[in-house]
């Protein structure tokens, strides 16, 4: 037989090069079970729809629409309480100047002549004198005319001054001035008083945070919940800081918090009342997909169990298991069994989170679609082990802008066994620094996310003399959502663009390479087709709403567009392998594909995603799409990826 004539030397040579590591890379992946791909459209609506935002009730009091009532002749506003806040740009002189300008405007002093009458008043009196023909001679005025003239002058005098409604408008305008300076709880009030000599007293409640009280909390301690606002006590209440505090609390596992303000015990103080709702302490996700590798089985099923806040300190424990194999042989030893443990807890406050994780993946490689593949002769099996500790810190947390950074230390190892001695096992220790930022814009309806990572690794096992003992890797991921108007309609489509780029000038371990194909790459190809040390991927998804004529109610008040999405997809990628062998060239490949994608989800119960993509172009240094052997021709049909997730 032909198979029997293959020498062990040729097999060993075949598995020792970078091409082999690229082909079986997916079996060496160390990062554990992948989480759900973030739905940018859902994230955009969660941030922009008011009902989904952490509640902070801070409504500016509306004007009391009562009758004007009697008018008051106001000579001056004085402040019974006015504290200066230079850091907010508020000083007594400026506030008093604004109050005086408002008093003068509402008193209409600029319209009053030296006689004490306005032009309108004088014109009204002149019209009456002309009517009774007394313009030139007051002797023509009868007693009745004089009485009427006197009544008119009394009425004019009574209408001068400031009404109750005017005073309310003045205090509201002063309140808006304070809030424009960031004191969003400040109020200018008129205390009960008797007006003497036209002087009206005003008082300012600036909105100093006096205390934080908590209600309805069960597992979370009051001390932990107050932590988000600890530095704001006895300080001016800032909308930005209050919003950030609520978001930091709502980032904690199983916690939902809203807030509202109450009057404080001391003048100018306010109390923040936190109303707590705690969700279930655990959740479970079961997922089935065909995103796996040919050599460990395309079909995968995984289950993740998360225990939220077990200690009452905002921690989370996640235990996961994944099994990959083929549908025909799901009970044999071919494929992989992966277990994952992850625990995280806040440290040094709510902004910083410590995480420890471990991944153990036992696998056996085989190519069941091609029995003559040398992979089957080698009987390769092995274990991946990953240990990591990390610190993640949130510098800014809000609805519109977020910024964070993380530092990690990792230990990643792959052990391999085969019927012959092979040296493709890897053991790397290193660290990485990651930076994340996202920004929401409602004016142009966009959501942009960016992640940048610098990674260092040092080989713990012996490597080829021509190969460096350590490496650096730079990675950049971007994710953007843009709403695009459709011509001749009022509808908007949703365009999502994703970039994934990584660079290294060294030959990387297989588990650090970036795969060009697969469900997270060019979806017209398999995850095993090519992986690179240097690579770039672009994915574009263009989603459209269903026409209103078929946007029917499906069930439970949900309309079709709320649970179903469809769109066009296009992917392209380029990657290369850094060769360290003498007189060798770097292998490279370029792939592209296009197709359709469909998504169906129902609240937090289940989610289904399906993509159908056809190869459009493929080229490589090894003739992946040369004139002699076209990978597109070999593919014959579109690649289909599907995943089903159920949430409990």
What are these regions (language model features)?
Residues 2-536, 542-648:
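Immediate N-terminus of the mature polypeptide
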